[in-house]
């Protein structure tokens, strides 16, 4: 090998901090006899190496091949420089240029939090290992990252572990290039790391020392108590999943009467009697992100293990959310309890996640019976991520811990000179930042109807603008005039002197999927959800929830078809009272006198019904909405499944549960295609008319006595056929082949799977959300893309 000296300066961008990149390069550079510095800097890793040029070129070739996930190189800036004289000696790992994160919503290079790796799990269980049962075991391949970061770049002094100096034994591992904890910033042991504390709800100490605290916490759980656990990105509430009374008590105290709970298990072997494990399930569960994975319930009454999860846990859902431990502390608790545990977010419903022990004791005092704390502070709230499986591949429904703040991998990255900040929606808020050709989607923040969530989001957005404002050319938000996010956007745009663009809700849903797949267009897109606002375009309604769009770069989005609008008596109240949606359907279709309508009409008080009907007759307080979500709510109420709901999508979930169950096949009903009828007014798009479907539903239920489960499946199949045929009609007219399926309604597995298969059978290519949520959690990406594609 040539001895001529050369110097190579590399800037590595992507997921490069907290993933062992510098130790990897250190080992490679040692083998190649190179010298220099390996530094974390804000947003990148900077390598300044000197040695023989062939050796440096070999490092360039090998580096991308040797990276181990989740490490990821999205960009590599290479510069050859004159060699230093005298030549540097040795290799030095360090960091430079501190940037405080504050409440910032994204970081540009830091890995997400990672669940315990296999080696750490083995050490945790090994009585001979010095970290046996240490609740905070980690290495450079796993452990907390974003949840403890207070500044960039990644180094121990920039985390909430700064107050825990390493003992001599840990320091030796940290400095040993041959040790897997070489420069692992999160390591520690029982001699130098964080400690546990267990308190009763009244503040009394229940135990002292890690082992005593764990034992007492397990005893509390086994007695049916509710434990508030300081987990990775915030507090969790735990109860034994088999204890139906404890689960119901948790529901009352948390004010979450019906939304399904997820369960935590220490080992997938416990799942065989509880859920189906389709292809991809185990891989999704073992992902280092440790998400909640939605799996089909299949409790076998004959298997005693089926009793490990009481019926109130899933609350009638066809799916059971399951997760493996995201931290060694969770693993110890689950293993010591020896049973499945309900694991839900540590907050009263609708409020932000608790992250501070004092805050948790105050806000959860009437919820939890005990509090298991530790003294490693949480820097920012991070909910659990949620995925479902489509064809064996994970599809994100909530992008949070374990996935954020990793930059999105887009097939067609935007131009490096564009800088935009999009706020997303008021529900499932998750802003997105576009900078230097990369998009970062912030972790799920919750719903802005909570004043505390709104304050937290405003602080995070302000931190983003303070840091990256000079590189931005504008802000983007939803076009709804009453949106909370829109008000925030107005204030921020004015204070930072930035232009503001507003994007219609469904345009953003559709463009988000186009961005994820790198689809250039022309594209068709079904956008279907609860409600989204649209700007005035000459139509008779602006509240929409099911429309077929034509997308093409540089052209305005065209609306090709939509669902026939239905009146919503009481406006927003219809979203929480499916009986109002049903009343609007029956009134619009002139079916109030049908015998099958009486079950729904009887859900109203004698005094309320005449007032609502009078309002419908006069068109007062009954806005029109072409909403698939509200249509589904109305059908559920017509069938008598649910008249008032306590959480978003509850009625639709009950319909899906019936349709997915074994009883649905008891009666086979031919699908009914919704006719695509011309609109009443010139210039308006044709409408899928739901009235024949409603009339037939009433007849089947009242006259033919068809059970509810086959009816629910029939409704799903009829809608699938109608959406697929609508796409075929538009594809022939406009020469399109790709069809986007976007919006929260396509979280319904039956709808998504049916539409995917139906479109593919016609030679069309379906596109759907995978690495970003189909619901409003993916809106911000679509808002960015809508602006970029309009240029």
Task: Name each model-derived stretch.
Residues 66, 173, 336-414, 620-625:
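Internal gly/pro-rich beta-alpha loop/helix module
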Residues 1-186, 190, 194-197:
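Intrinsically disordered, low-complexity, mixed-charge
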Residues 272-278, 353-360, 384-385, 405-418, ...:
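Conserved phosphate-binding catalytic cores of ATP/NTP-utilizing and phosphoryl-transfer enzymes
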